[in-house]
Amino acid sequence: TSVLALLGMEADPLTSREHILLANVLQRAWTAGTDLDLPRLIAQVQEPPFETIGVMGLEQVFPRKDRFTFAMQLNNLLAAPGFEAWMQGVPLDTSRLLFTESGKPRVSVLSIAHLGDQERMFFVTMLLNDLIGWMRQQPGTGTLRAILYMDEIAGYLPPVANPASKPPFLTLLKQ
């Protein structure tokens, strides 16, 4: 969803064929225990390791020509000079943001003011999904473990639209 938001594409999990294709490719890789970096993801968008999506044939749902166009968009994102910075540095890891190596709690302040709108949506969605993944790995407790504070949330959790950041925000609000 965040990659599609970065590309400025619709990320609806039920209607966006790009989302459905990516979800199926990622699901198969995860189930098989296979690592999938962006170059391999792009290759599998062009030539998915499956013939059907749901009960329909892959070519009916997402023809080869359209998959190639989508793969080119992903490749252009990867090849863009500004995207190189996203591939460097310390990986996003909620446990490292919340705790020191010795296990002491810490405060992490993340500023995204310098990013464009699509990059902000990408980062916020990635951060929220990583936080949800971390949260689901924690055993139950009656004490507070973490606080997420975000200023100017309106664009990420609007009342009517459904941007990529909204589903993970709603998941966190339910916890």
Which positions does each model-derived feature cover?
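P-loop NTPase motor domains
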Residues: 1-174
